[in-house]
Design a protein with these regions (language model features):
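Conserved RecA-like P-loop NTPase helicase motor core
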Residues: 791, 799, 803-813, 865-968
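Signature of the SF2 helicase/ATPase Hel1-core->accessory helical subdomain module
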Residues: 351, 357, 374-377, 381, ...
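Conserved pre-motif I regulatory segment
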Residues: 291-338
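Conserved non-catalytic scaffold segment of RNase H-like nuclease domains
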Residues: 2-151, 164-185
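A contiguous, basic/glycine-rich beta-loop/short-helix subdomain that forms a polymer-engagement track
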Residues: 468-502, 512-513, 517-519, 658-806, ...
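Acidic two-metal-ion nuclease catalytic site recognized across multiple nuclease folds
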Residues: 2-37, 199-296
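Acidic, Mg2+-coordinating catalytic module of metal-dependent nucleases/exonucleases
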Residues: 122-142, 161-237, 962
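A substrate-engagement module of RecA-like helicase motors
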Residues: 271-287, 294-298, 303-308, 370-502, ...
Length: 1007
């Protein structure tokens, strides 16, 4: 293994928004590791890694073991052996590890290899990356069983805890982040790499705050979490150093969550507040804004203008200027706008510039809502910082901006404080007892290294530490009664910043949830840009839905049935006993009476709630669609036929009992909440009881709407699981006409809403989107439209091939013909192809048929199977120029693979919504032309999104293959083809398409 000569910066490997002092801390670790002495953690260490035939602990076996003895950072001895697993090594494993059957043919058996390893290790401390995996495979047979007695340190735990702001904690990424030897994913190479980063990880732990290290060291005994020994030894070292420096013995470092959080906001780390003349205030939001002139916007997009000066390779784009001026016009005239701007227009800067200038000049605020986190991060961490810098240099003003997501994206300090008090416990995950200690440690370290960033990038296993135990909801939040309210609180501290920001960036979910919460979640904002707007209708419908979630019902039921104070607020309240019986006998008697009454109501509710949620699953038998029989999860339209069924009648009866219990619970708990008002020392538990009231009331209202009423404004659906042991049922009431709701809740409260996307129109027609979003129905909802083509030459760079001789999807021989075509197409193009399926079963059947032929030709094909990491597939696809991918919905949009990585996209079947989809069924009953009014336009938009995966830069080129014959045989085929970004469309046979792919010349005529 060779050292990488190229210097890499830690900055490139940390998550966006990481505080500068934390980046500096990370950057110093390599130097610290060179000179430090870590005592027993640095002596008699054996670093180990294994390779196996797979990840199944029961079925798979070892193929290689590598270990190196490490003394103060120096490798003194090696142990490396192949292992004969007694079974063939799967091809995908061989590709990953570069270990083949021929390598292991004459190697020792697993027992023999582990015996040799045990002799090599002796009594040394073992270090491994994801140690539980390696420990299992080397100790599961008699040869290595004795190694269970050794101390095992998990370097992955160390990395996640000490370096929580890194984007990834994979060994290869740690190697790159700290400029260590490059791993080749063989066990011996990985061991050498881990040897190089091990002391850096120890340095990272040593650099953590002393009190936090000490707290982590006491989270769990060594038997439950052996890696905790590292924190115990380093805590002892830190105490010794503190003793030496102070001259007095340091017994311990008491941990304070509040003090740790305050430390993050010391004066040195405080961001500059928005200047007084530009900071929005409550009154300014209702006043007209002052916007720049159109000429000023046009000048800004010239090569020497505000935007042009931001980029070294800036090229003026007419479409970008037109869009910016249209956004300006919409804002300055208080009208709404719908704009489709093709790929390459630069639409985000086209709306950010007029937004920023208007907000700065008016002391007001403009909001931006995105569908994906990728675009949100691009705006907040790339484009707005650039814009802020250039506006400041030009003397325009100090632009302030804040990104804000929902409550569930941020840790709740109050709940985290409960976790700190309770400590770690063992929990069962898929049959194994696992300690919560490493998850709690990583969470606390992340909080210490974070100002207000969300925890979406934090690598926590929420089966071990449930997300609801870390985050709060708008209902649960104590607000001003919380001891952490103010700057220490992630949500309210960030919201306070948002109130004084010129630009507020959020996601579609919170944007529409704020409507449902009547403006409680976001600061008042009268001007909005909704980007990626093609997904806005569906997100609005999800946000405004009324739900009965079985998992939430069961969770509340279990809380109220629990006998421990940690989970049951009534038990906790009774044990806290705020009333002194001796001095306040009457009040004390009333308190205990009300508490017992509420607790009794809670126990009764628990039984009825569990029964009700359990019987939701009875509705599975109402699904008469044969095609759904092999699916684990189904979605059922609750129509009149279902409502008159025996199963629904039974469920309604259980629902009636549930409602009666819920009403009694609400009444008893409400009395208790009222009694506790003004009582000292019970604010947190009072809020917990109030949350029970709010949750139960919400369930009551949902139950009444879904079970007892049929409101024509809603479509009713049931999401069901066929697995008896799985609690995943959810009854929903979804608004049919979301546009009418938006007309009443959004447009009346805003001056202007701009909807933008690369895919909104069907052909050149915005009618479907306007209707879906309720635009143009009233004076407040009036809207203009703007269609802008791509700044890229799609006609030149994208060739569209429409197959004419493939059977239609419902005809005999379709799948076999498709499989043969896909095999030939991949061979002709030499890989680099993305095939986008609408059906998992068809995708997996095609993969099984196509993959063997491609393997013989030396081409890799991967498939988005159950349990496969989407991120892993994306990363793998981008790294391997010839890799091809079979994928589902998550790859139809938001997946960028510029350059030669992606040369072809195949769409085997048009993405029409399932005819059994509850919304489609309801629309079909109400509208005889529902398919053409709703299903067809949505499918067109999805195809446009998929086509956009192919051309992501000026120099990209490739071929889009539409393998659905209905584009030729059905009248609606013209609607799809007219809507594509490229007009270079050729109808051809499969053989002609294969020849075109083989030539690989985009735009060449088919002979």
């Amino acid at each position: 293994m060779q050292i990488d000569d190229q210097h890499t910066s830690v900055y490139d490997f940390v998550t966006d928004g990481t505080p500068t002092d934390v980046v500096a801390r990370y950057a110093s670790l390599k130097t610290q590791a060179l000179h430090a002495d870590y005592g027993d953690l640095d002596r008699n260490i054996v670093v180990i890694d294994t390779e196996t035939t797979g990840v199944s602990e029961r079925k798979d076996e070892l193929t290689q073991i590598a270990a190196a003895r490490l003394e103060r950072g120096e490798i003194t001895e090696w142990f490396v052996t192949f292992v004969n697993p007694g079974k063939p090594i799967p091809d995908e494993i061989s590709h990953l590890t570069n270990i083949f059957d021929t390598d292991v043919a004459d190697a020792p058996t697993p027992v023999e290899a582990c015996e040799q390893l045990a002799r090599f290790v002796g009594d040394a401390t073992l270090v491994a990356h994801n140690a539980a995996f390696d420990r299992h495979f080397v100790t599961k047979n008699a040869g290595g069983a004795c190694l269970k007695e050794n101390l095992w340190i998990d370097s992955l735990d160390l990395a996640r805890i000490a370096l929580p702001r890194l984007k990834s904690h994979r060994l290869i990424d740690l190697v790159h982040a700290f400029d260590a030897p490059i791993s080749t994913h063989r066990a011996d190479a990985d061991v050498e790499a881990l040897c190089a980063v091990y002391r850096i990880l120890l340095a990272a732990v040593s650099d953590m705050p002393n009190d936090l290290v000490e707290y982590i060291s006491k989270l769990a005994p060594i038997e439950e979490w052996s890696t905790g020994a590292v924190f115990a030894l380093i805590a002892a070292q830190q105490r010794e150093h503190a003793t030496s420096a102070a001259g007095e013995k340091a017994e311990t470092f008491p941990f304070s969550l509040s003090a740790m959080r305050r430390g993050r906001f010391s004066q040195a780390n405080q961001p500059k507040p928005a200047s007084e003349n530009t900071a929005p205030n409550a009154q300014s939001e209702d006043l007209p804004m002052e916007f720049p002139a159109a000429e000023e916007i046009e000048a800004a997009f010239s090569p020497d203008g505000l935007v042009g000066s931001l980029y070294n390779d800036f090229e003026p784009r007419d479409e970008q200027v037109v869009m910016a001026k249209e956004v300006l016009k919409a804002f300055s005239t208080s009208t709404n706008l719908v704009v489709e701007a093709g790929t390459g227009v630069g639409k985000s800067m086209a709306y950010l510039l007029p937004s920023a200038l208007g907000a700065l000049r008016s002391g007001s605020r403009i909001g931006v809502a995105t569908k994906t986190n990728a675009l949100l991060d691009q705006i907040v961490y790339k484009e707005l910082p650039l814009l802020k810098s250039t506006l400041a240099e030009a003397g325009v003003g100090d632009l302030s901006y804040v990104a804000l997501k929902g409550f569930s994206h941020y840790p709740c300090m109050r709940k985290v404080s409960h976790i700190v008090s309770d400590g770690a416990r063992m929990v069962n995950v898929t049959g194994k007892d696992v300690s919560q200690a490493p998850s709690i440690a990583a969470l606390l370290s992340y909080i210490e290294q974070t100002e207000y960033d969300d925890m979406d990038g934090l690598k926590l296993d929420y089966r071990v530490l449930p997300r609801y135990s870390i985050t709060t909801t708008s209902r649960e939040c104590l607000k001003r009664k919380c001891p952490f309210f103010g700057p220490q609180c992630f949500v309210h501290g960030l919201r306070k910043r948002a109130e004084s920001a010129n630009v507020l960036v959020t996601n579609h979910s919170l944007f529409f949830c704020d409507l449902a919460a009547e403006g409680f979640l976001l600061p008042p904002t009268r001007y909005w840009v909704v980007d990626e707007a093609h997904g806005a209708e569906a997100e609005a419908r999800r946000a405004l839905a009324v739900k009965l979630d079985a998992a939430e019902i069961v969770r509340l039921a279990h809380r109220l049935a629990a006998t421990d104070a940690k989970r049951n607020p009534f038990v906790r309240l009774e044990r806290r006993a705020p009333m002194n019986e001796a001095t306040m006998p009457e009040a004390s008697s009333l308190f205990y009476g009300l508490t017992e009454k509420a607790a009794k109501a809670g126990r009764a509710f628990s039984g009825d709630a569990i029964a009700f949620s359990h019987h939701m699953k009875d509705l599975v038998v109402c699904d008469t669609n044969r095609q759904n029989r092999n699916y684990e999860n189904i979605e059922l339209w609750i129509n009149d036929e279902v409502r008159t069924s025996q199963q629904f009648a039974g469920l309604r009866e259980y629902g009636r009992k549930f409602q009666e219990s819920a009403e009694k619970l609400v009444a008893a708990a409400s009395e208790l909440v009222a009694f506790l008002e003004g009582v000292d020392g019970v604010a947190d538990v009072q809020r917990d009881v109030a949350t029970v009231v709010i949750d139960a009331k919400g369930m009551l209202q949902a139950c009444d709407l879904i079970l007892n009423k049929v409101d024509e404004n809603y479509v009713y659906a049931a999401k069901l699981s066929r697995k008896p042991e799985r609690v995943a049922e959810c009854l929903e009431a979804l608004i049919v006409n979301i546009g009418a709701t938006l007309d009443e809740t959004l447009y009346e409260k805003t001056h202007s809403v701009v909807y933008a996307s690369a895919t909104i129109a069907v052909g050149d027609d915005f009618k479907n989107f306007l209707g879906a979003m309720g635009l143009g129905e009233t004076e407040e909802s009036r809207a203009n439209t703007c269609m802008l083509g791509s700044s890229y030459d799609f006609d030149k760079n994208m060739q569209v091939l429409v197959l004419t001789d493939i059977p239609e999807p419902n005809q005999p021989g379709y799948l076999e013909t498709l499989e043969d075509f896909l095999m030939q197409a991949h061979l002709a193009q030499n890989g680099s192809m993305l095939t986008l399926f609408t059906n998992r079963r068809e995708m997996e059947e095609c993969f099984g048929a196509v993959d063997p032929s491609l393997k013989e030709a030396g081409l890799r094909l991967v498939c988005q199977k159950w349990g496969v990491s989407t991120k892993g597939l994306r990363d793998d696809f981008l790294k391997d120029e010839h890799l091809s991918l079979f994928a589902l919905k998550s790859f139809w949009e938001g997946f960028d693979a510029p350059g030669a990585t992606l040369k072809g996209v195949v769409i085997p079947k048009l993405p029409f919504a399932k005819p059994t989809d509850p919304l489609s069924c309801e629309r079909a009953v109400r509208d005889s032309s529902a398919w053409s009014h709703y299903t067809l336009p949505q499918a067109v938009i999805e195809v446009k999104q998929a086509a956009g995966r192919l051309i992501r830069s000026q120099t990209d080129s490739g071929t889009l293959v539409l393998a659905d014959k209905r584009l030729v045989t059905k009248g609606y085929g013209r609607v799809f083809l007219r809507s594509l970004p490229s007009k270079n469309i050729v109808k051809c046979t499969r053989a002609e398409a294969i020849e075109a792919l083989r030539r690989g010349v985009v735009g060449s005529a088919i002979q």
